Swiss-Prot record:
Keyword ATP-binding assigned: no
The name this protein goes by in its record: S-layer protein A
Subunit structure: The mushroom-shaped unit cells of the Sulfolobales' S-layers may consist of three SlaB subunits and six SlaA subunits.
Keywords, ordered alphabetically: Cell wall, S-layer, Secreted, Signal
Signal peptide extent: 1-35
Organism annotation: Saccharolobus solfataricus (strain ATCC 35092 / DSM 1617 / JCM 11322 / P2)
One Gene Ontology cellular component: S-layer
Described purpose of this protein according to its UniProt entry: S-layer large protein. May form the highly ordered outer sheath.
Family designation: Belongs to the Sulfolobales SlaA family.
Reported induction: Constitutively expressed.
Subcellular location: Secreted, Cell wall, S-layer
């Protein structure tokens, strides 16, 4: 019974805590400072009709002279008796009705009175709820009035004997007084209307205790998981199973800084509970010749129970089903005691330790109707069928006076192994099922009885349900000794003799007429308690799930009710992603991790960085029986699995203060509490070389959210074949239970692979041998893990090694000299001479490039038997490297030269595009014409200038150009004396401009190599009537005309009697070293090539204006020609202005997609095309009539129609891209 604590308790507690008093010793007769005749400690002037407290009601001995005299004479027993005789009690209703006074005479109430020496008062302990005498320790009484319990505190009973601190005191039921006073009309406090007064009168003083309205305190539930990350949950009123949330209560009836509260959680679900039961045993009972009952279900034949591995073994399969099912609504209640702390300056108590699925007892309650159907035969026999769950039990009675019973034991079937002492596996005929035995075992006894009373036939049915107490080791060992079903059932029945819960109900039906059907239903609660693993059962029975609601109520230690509201169950599903996306390029350097992140609100059970079970410490198993929960990593070499493991759950964020506010009854407080984790789990993956596959883990705690680091070691030669698969399994059993079929209780697999990257050998394109020591490097992203690479001779190669790992080998060094290849034997002696360094160093932190000055060019010449390094001038140094990771062999080369300023062969020729067509004479005659179109490639060259590169000069200047052809010569030169650029043609002055405007060459990415056009030329586009456009030399913003383009270059042609020879010009150029001012001369050419102007395409298909040469374009869409649709329409355009007539020549072949053989008909058809405006951007739609090449008179098989452009009948094709347009599937029909 909870006791009401008042201000005295608080004061004494504070005084003793502060050390102001060392004990609580009260002198006889002098301790009571309260001179009221009647009073209470703590003060109670009203109670609600639902109050559950004990009221300490004091009657002052000094207020009654007779009582006082007895107390002074130490006759405490007589003082009690005289006091009781002087007390009257009555009940006054709100209407004013007053019941007659009753006396608390010593005859009836003496054993309830006590003399408290310290208070010099007689005290009654009024219990507001008890219906009969209740007791409490004197220790508890002393605490309730605010004193420190001790043996020196004196309390006497009506026999004048001392009541020691460890002895019991009788509590007077207030219900007894109410019943006596109202002559039985009201029998307890709860039955009295609000406003009723309970009046105690003594020594002329009346003490009134009013019946007040029921007080219901207000409270609220807050979910810090939502506060920490609102994206994690659908709303504030959702909670993940097993997690803690914050509870706040407004309670102005208590004043202690901390206080216990008792909360009741009621779980309900919109979905029906679905419970599968396994029948572990069954038996029957009969008397007076009744037949043995039969059932549609039965247990398999028992063989043995093994407690050591929690297994029940059956010898064979049952002949009938052993599984029953309950499908109906079920409510569940659980209780949770939580200590709340008072927030300063308010009446609000809070705690962050309210668990939404506490580990304590869960009471499951549903409705089970057992239907009985009977029939009384005319011969006086009867049958009775009981339907329970989805099974039936059949009774047969040959005559009245017979009775039979069917008893069976059920255990729930669960999807997972619940562990020893919580679950057992049943095995029969190869079938294996997990069950809740021995924790949840329910027995049902169904009894049928057939009797006759007078002329009435009576069919009677009863149902007895009992839940066995969780079986202990003694009972389990007894069950283990059973050798057959009879012994096993007997042991179970004996264990059911003192059940955890039990219920009984019966029904009956009577008739006087034989041949009559009878029916009745026995309603049962199907109520059982789960003492351990309650969360597992909540989920398994479909209570905690997506449609579950939890209503929370409570009481403080006064018994005052609290309304807290409700919340919804939330089953969270994990997610997982990585950055960067696969495939990866390279190993891991320093903190350049492959980042991954798991998000799972269902992982909140583990709320500390050490992953202790902070939320639900009594849960069996670290992850709520989800032993495979956590991060999984599997490593494959190709398709072969080489390593797989569960790395376990990930470390949660360190808890940090989270502040929010709550307002209750107008009071607002800021709540600061340690947050639940945000359920975001960063994972960093590192990939490093190893001699074998292995995985290590560690945690980085330098951030608020710890980072889990997973390092995967891989043999270098297998990296590209390695596949790493990762996934995360939620530890929440609800996620597994509801989503195991879809697999969403775990994340989708994240697969990491590695890209095949070929390393690059970094060597100068050109190296002057005079510098003697040539640089060398390797660029490979898979090397970023290293800071340097050692190189040295090993078995005929130059081995590259880091930390004992061979990353690659230089397999050959060859020199191409004077057309001959000479290889260097990579012996240790030769390598020691050739290499001037034993290490390649990374150019910067985590760089894929490793370089050093490596090759001794003088030693190279010596190894080749050359007199000196200059003898290597013009040779190429080839180096071949074998990369262990990719397996690739890569080669690069360097041109070795003596000088530092020269033209690199080969140079790039310039090129002018010409359009080949024909000038129209008549329909069958024309003259070929080439029309200048454009310069498509400027004459260009590469020049090596080491001096300019060393001086960081990015451009070198062309100082002179001479273009020489058979018909003309153009000279462009820079005159430094007057700083001007001058142009001559055939020795004659043409133009002059200030500055050097010829051209400049820009440095490429290769050291010392400069590239660009040596002169910039422009050719105007000609026409059919004036085909030779003017050529210009471009000098800055100036264009200088130097005659027509055909003076310098011509593509040439040969058609019929017409022939034109091609023309090419030589281009000589001079460049100057800006450092030494030395000049050098090089040569290239200016050439030409032919193009054709017309572009063709099927109607609706776009025509590219410029494109690479294409001979055929195949149009495979079927075309059907008929007398009403006789045309094939195509699109035609030209890349130049072409205001001249030309023809679309059409040839037809029999068959689908046939372009060879004999055309049908034998002669081609021609369609004239003419538009004065035809040119770039102008598209003509040209219809070609079909009767010219396909007969429409009779249905035909498919034809292939080929079209191309010609300047006249029999002329050359002048269409390009395509040259031939092919309609591959053309059919003609007659109508």
């Amino acid at each position: 019974m909870n006791k009401t604590l008042g201000l005295i308790l608080t004061s004494v507690f504070l005084l003793s805590t502060l050390g102001i008093i060392t004990g609580f010793v009260i002198p006889t007769q002098a301790a009571n400072s309260n001179d009221a005749a009647i009073y209470t400690i703590p003060s109670v002037t009203s109670v609600s009709n639902t109050s559950n407290i004990v009221i300490n009601l004091f009657f002052n001995a000094t207020s009654n002279s007779t009582v006082g005299a007895q107390a002074s004479a130490f006759n405490y027993g007589l003082a009690i008796n005289y006091t009781l005789d002087a007390i009257t009690f009555t009940v006054v209703l709100p209407s004013g009705t007053s019941y007659p006074l009753i006396k608390l005479n010593a005859k009836n109430f003496a054993n309830y009175g006590y003399y408290d020496l310290a208070h010099n008062s007689i005290v009654l302990l009024l219990n507001t709820t008890a219906s009969s005498t209740a007791k409490e320790l004197a220790y508890s009484y002393e605490q309730s009035i605010g004193v420190t319990p001790s043996a020196s505190y004196k309390i006497y009973n009506y026999t004048n004997k001392t009541v020691n601190v460890n002895q019991y005191m009788n509590e007077l039921p207030l219900s007894m007084l109410i019943y006596m006073a109202t002559n039985g009309k009201y029998n307890n406090l709860a039955s009295l209307p609000v406003g009723t007064k309970l009046e105690f009168t003594y020594a002329g003083v009346t003490y009134i205790i009013a019946v007040s309205p029921t007080v219901k305190l207000v409270g609220e539930l807050l979910n810090p998981l939502y506060t920490a990350n609102s994206k994690m949950l659908p709303g504030t009123n959702y909670a993940v199973g097993r997690s803690n949330i914050t509870v706040a209560v407004y309670d102005n009836l208590i004043t202690t800084t901390t206080s216990p509260f008792n909360f009741t959680l009621t779980y309900s679900s919109l979905a029906p509970a679905l419970i599968y039961w396994f029948v572990i045993a069954n038996t029957t009972y009969t008397n007076n010749g009744a037949s043995t009952p039969t059932a549609s279900f039965q247990a398999p034949p028992f063989k043995q129970y093994f407690p050591s591995n929690s297994t029940i073994l059956y010898s064979a399969a049952p002949t009938k089903s052993s599984i029953l099912m309950f499908n109906g609504q079920m409510n569940v209640t659980a209780h949770e005691n939580v200590t709340l702390t008072l927030q300063t300056g308010t009446n609000i108590y809070t705690s962050p330790n309210f668990n939404v699925t506490p580990p304590g007892n869960y009471t499951f309650s549903g409705k089970l109707g057992v239907g009985f159907n009977g029939f009384i035969y005319q011969n006086g026999s009867a049958t009775l069928t009981a339907t329970i769950f989805n099974g039936t039990i059949n009774f047969f009675f040959s005559s009245t006076g017979q009775k039979a019973a069917f008893t069976f034991f059920l255990v729930p079937i669960v999807p997972i192994n619940l562990g020893d002492n919580n679950g057992a596996t049943v095995i029969y005929n190869g079938v294996s099922l997990n069950t809740g035995f021995p924790q949840v075992v329910v027995m049902f006894n169904i009894t049928g009885n057939f009797t006759k009373s007078g002329s009435n036939y009576l069919l009677y049915g009863s149902v007895y349900e009992a839940e066995l107490k969780p079986l202990g080791s003694t009972q389990l060992q007894k069950l283990a000794g059973a050798t057959d079903s009879t012994q096993f059932v007997g042991n179970l029945i004996s264990s059911a003799s003192s059940p955890l819960v039990s219920y009984f109900n019966y029904g009956e039906s009577t008739t006087t007429i034989t041949g009559t059907s009878l029916s009745f239903t026995v309603l049962m609660p199907l109520k059982f308690i789960v003492e351990r693993l309650g969360y597992i059962y909540l989920v398994t029975f479909h209570i905690w799930g997506p449609s579950a609601t939890v209503t929370v109520t409570g009481v403080d230690y006064h018994g005052t009710q609290i309304a807290l509201g409700s919340f919804r169950a939330y089953v969270a599903l994990p997610s997982f992603y990585t950055l960067p996306k696969t495939p990866l390029v390279g190993l891991t350097c320093d903190n350049m991790y492959t980042l991954a992140q798991v998000s799972d609100a269902g992982s909140v059970l583990e709320t500390s960085t050490a992953n202790s079970n902070a939320n639900n410490a009594t849960v069996i198993g670290p992850y709520d029986l989800m032993s495979n929960a956590g991060l999984h990593v599997a490593i494959y070499n190709g398709s072969k699995l080489v390593k797989s493991g569960n790395l376990g759950l990930l470390p949660n964020a360190t808890t940090a203060p989270i502040t929010t506010t709550i307002t209750l009854n107008g009071q607002t407080v800021a709540l600061t509490y340690s947050s639940a984790p945000t359920a975001i789990y960063p994972v960093d993956f590192k990939f490093e070389p190893g001699f074998s596959y292995s995985v290590t883990t560690n945690v980085i705690y330098n951030t608020s959210i710890p980072t889990y680091v997973v390092t995967v070691y891989m043999p270098l030669k297998y990296i590209l074949q390695t596949k790493i698969v990762m996934w995360y399994v939620s530890p929440d059993y609800a996620a597994y239970f509801y989503y195991s079929s879809t697999g969403q209780y775990q994340t989708s697999n994240v697969t990491l692979t590695f890209a095949n990257v070929t390393p690059e050998l970094v060597m100068p394109q050109v190296f002057p041998v005079g510098k003697l020591y040539m640089p060398f490097g390797i660029n490979d992203p898979y090397y970023v893990f290293y800071s340097s690479i050692s190189i040295g001779p090993q078995s005929g190669v130059i081995e590259a090694v880091e930390n004992g790992f061979n990353v690659g080998n230089i397999t050959s060094i060859t020199v191409e000299l004077n057309g001959m290849n000479e290889s260097i034997v990579l012996s240790p002696l030769n390598v020691s001479k050739l290499l001037i360094s034993s290490n390649l160093g990374e150019v910067s932190q985590c760089s894929p490039l490793f370089t050093t000055t490596l090759f001794n060019i003088s030693a190279l010449a010596s190894l080749l038997g050359l007199p000196n390094a200059a003898a290597l001038n013009g040779s190429y140094l080839y180096v071949t490297y074998h990369d262990i990771i990719s397996g690739a062999y890569v080669t690069n080369r360097t041109l070795l030269v003596v000088g530092q300023f020269y033209v690199m062969p080969p140079t790039t020729p310039g090129s002018v595009e010409w359009i080949l067509t024909a000038k129209y004479i008549n329909a069958t005659t024309g003259i070929p014409v080439e029309i200048s179109y454009a310069v498509v490639q400027q004459p260009s060259a590469k020049v090596v200038d080491i001096n300019a590169a060393n001086a960081s000069i990015t451009q070198i200047q062309v100082t002179g150009v001479k273009i020489v052809s058979k018909y003309a010569t153009v000279t462009v030169m820079y005159n430094p004396s007057n700083a001007s650029t001058i142009v001559y043609m055939n020795g004659m002055f043409v133009a002059s401009y200030g500055g050097n405007l010829i051209s400049s060459l820009s440095e490429t990415s290769t050291f010392g190599v400069y590239y660009g056009a040596v002169v910039n030329l422009y050719v105007a586009t000609g026409t059919l009537s004036s085909p030779n456009g003017t050529m210009y030399v471009v000098l800055g913003s100036h264009k200088v005309a130097v005659g027509t383009a055909n003076l310098y270059t011509y593509a040439g042609y040969h058609f019929g009697p017409y022939t034109a020879l091609p023309l090419v010009s030589n281009v000589t150029f001079t460049v100057q070293d800006p450092v030494t001012h030395a000049t050098l001369t090089g040569q290239t050419t200016l050439g030409a090539f032919n193009n054709t102007p017309i572009r063709l395409a099927p109607l609706g298909v776009s025509i590219p204006q410029t494109a690479q040469y294409k001979v055929f374009y195949y149009y495979s869409t079927p075309l059907v020609l008929s007398p009403t649709s006789q045309y094939i329409v195509l699109s035609v355009t030209s890349v130049i202005s072409y205001p001249y007539p030309f023809y679309i020549e059409t040839v037809s072949f029999l068959g689908y997609n046939v372009t060879t053989g004999t055309p049908v008909p034998g002669t081609p058809a021609f369609q004239t095309v003419y538009s004065p405006s035809l040119g770039p951007g102008v598209v003509l739609q040209v219809p070609v009539q079909s009767y010219q090449f396909i007969s429409l008179s009779t249905p035909s098989e498919p034809h292939t129609v080929v079209m191309f452009a010609v300047p006249f009948a029999g002329g050359p094709a002048i269409s390009l891209y395509p040259t031939f347009l092919v309609y591959a599937n053309v059919t003609a029909i007659s109508s």
